[in-house]
Amino acid sequence: MLQGHERSITQIKYNREGDLLFSCSKDQKPNVWYSLNGERLGTYDGHQGAVWCLDVDWESRKLITGAGDMTTKIWDVEYGTIIASIPSKSSVRTSNFSFSGNQAAYSTDKAMGQSCELFIIDVRNADSSLAEQTPTLRIPMTESKITSMLWGPLDETIITGHDNGNIAIWDIRKGQKVVDSGSDHTAGINDMQLSKDGTMFVTASKDTTAKLFDSESLMCLKTYKTERPVNSAAISPILDHVVLGGGQDAMEVTTTSTKAGKFDSRFFHLIYEEEFARLKGHFGPINSLAFHPDGKSYASGGEDGFVRVQTFDSTYFENIFE
């Protein structure tokens, strides 16, 4: 159990090796933890608003965060210093490094008279001058705002999940939409996470389902049904398992007994779509989930401001569907 945030967690992410766990919350300060023993290594101090998203590059050298103070910041992971701070005209909802680490993408909210926009920036030689540079690509979103985002293979495309349940793939060379999923989801998408090999990704939606999609065609492969909105979903890197977390919207939560099972992490079989386990822990909805890259543990961040790291016991790895 990692205690270091004063307000609800918005996103958690492991680095590629899995030794570091990054968390951001509505209390303005992203944290980094040593995932093995839960020791807090440091905080990234500099935002003036709720931090909505973060991502770390492959080499664990740079961290990107987007916040409600209308800035995207790039940090030095080791020293905690700000490399660049990029202003925008509304709050930043998603931010991701590309696989190569040469580029980063972020999206802004549709608010204060501003439309939602997707930006791509070159971060190879990132320094304070990045704030004045024009982004390499800027795509205005005319329909629904972006709520989550992934990079496609070879840094050629970006997959966006929207507030109306749509998913789209954008070709960043042409700057236009190449695939649209249509309306597989009937309500907003809260989270999208790729599988380890990048061939498919799982979505978490307010329509109470999580779905598995093909990364290239956006064909819906599987559906995992629950009774309440799903805030986050992640795919195990070693087994055919998906974990879902959610609960009601923060506004609708009353102090209910945890026995009601509303705030459990729920494990589904990737292929059979069957729920096989639930893990308790949080005193409120789960906002973000992440599997450790070795698949032997997972972390969850909740509305209660805690990050919980749970290690699986040996029985988890025995195939229960034989």
Curated annotation (Swiss-Prot):
Predominant cellular place of this UniProt entry's protein: cytoplasm
Protein localization: Cytoplasm
SUPFAM superfamilies, alphabetized: WD40 repeat-like
CC per GO annotation: eukaryotic 43S preinitiation complex; eukaryotic 48S preinitiation complex; eukaryotic translation initiation factor 3 complex, eIF3m
InterPro entries referenced in this protein's UniProt entry, alphabetically: eIF3i (IPR027525), WD40/YVTN_repeat-like_dom_sf (IPR015943), WD40_repeat_CS (IPR019775), WD40_repeat_dom_sf (IPR036322), WD40_rpt (IPR001680)
Record GO terms (molecular function): RNA binding; translation initiation factor activity
Tree of life domain: Eukaryota
GO BP terms, alphabetized: formation of cytoplasmic translation initiation complex
Pfam families reported in the protein's UniProt record: EIF3I (PF24805)
Gene3D superfamilies linked: YVTN repeat-like/Quinoprotein amine dehydrogenase
Keyword set, alphabetical order: Cytoplasm, Initiation factor, Protein biosynthesis, Repeat, WD repeat
WD repeats: 4-43, 46-85, 141-180, 184-223, 281-322
SMART domains from the UniProt entry: WD40 (SM00320)
Assembly and binders: Component of the eukaryotic translation initiation factor 3 (eIF-3) complex. The eIF-3 complex interacts with pix.
Family: Belongs to the eIF-3 subunit I family.
Purpose of the protein: Component of the eukaryotic translation initiation factor 3 (eIF-3) complex, which is involved in protein synthesis of a specialized repertoire of mRNAs and, together with other initiation factors, stimulates binding of mRNA and methionyl-tRNAi to the 40S ribosome. The eIF-3 complex specifically targets and initiates translation of a subset of mRNAs involved in cell proliferation.
HAMAP family: eIF3i
Stated name of the protein: Eukaryotic translation initiation factor 3 subunit I
Organism: Drosophila ananassae
Species classification: Eukaryota, Metazoa, Ecdysozoa, Arthropoda, Hexapoda
Gene: eIF3i
